[in-house]
Amino acid sequence: MCIRDSAITDHGLSHYMFGIKRSNLPVLRARIDKLNEEYNEKGLKILMGVEANLLDFNGTVDLDADIMDYLDIVLMGFHYGIKTNNFIEQMKLSLLPQISKPFKKWHEKITERVTDSYIKAIEKYPINIITHPGDKIDVNVVRLAKACKEHGVALEINSSHKNLSVEDLIKIKDIDVDLYVGSDAHKLERVGDVKEALRRANEAQIDIKRIKNIYVE
């Protein structure tokens, strides 16, 4: 069993600390193209992507046509520390899921609104994978998985974050949505470290063939 494809997916432009600079997009594209010349014949494909940021309840994502021209793959997730032109709407998405937690019915409504925002995003943008769904802000993972299956979008099992959790995977086990494992490596030595993601998939008894970036001989 091995990783078949590897994607380099820096955070989207809106992230304060880790967001890729627009000026670096052509530089990264050129480097990845050169690496593929060397490694494609060895069976490894390197993709250039970005982990775009969900910005508000309307499903707005920090992607535009200029960015898309450089990309092979688009990931999208929710993150804190985002700069946006609509600060109030971004803060609603960041804060309401947290402050509603002590109030069950209200939190359930907010969770459905969060789920709606993800679904709106995959309807508006050419997103391939949703990263760590349910991390930081809760989602209805069953509704999200069904929508992702309908739109050909995959979900990530993230080795560095708790989601998708074993419980999440059990809930969506019978929904034939594609899955990917990700290391979320912010350090060089952690690139490709997906042991925790695979452990969760195994515990939830997920068919390994559903994990699209794992090759089983």
Task: Locate predicted features.
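Short acidic/histidine-rich active-site segments
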Residues: 11, 177-192
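Active-site metal-binding loops of divalent metal-dependent hydrolases
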Residues: 10-12, 51-52, 78-79, 133, ...
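His/Asp/Glu-enriched short active-site or ligand-binding loop at hydrolase and phosphoryl-transfer sites
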Residues: 152-163
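Extended substrate/RNA-proximal surfaces in nucleic-acid metabolism proteins
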Residues: 17-150, 202-210
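Short, small-residue-biased leader/transition segments that mark boundaries at the very start
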Residues: 1-3
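Hydrophobic residues within beta-strands of alpha/beta enzymes
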Residues: 6-8, 74, 130, 155
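Histidine/acidic-residue-rich catalytic or RNA/ligand-binding cores of hydrolases
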Residues: 18-19, 139-145, 163-175, 189-202
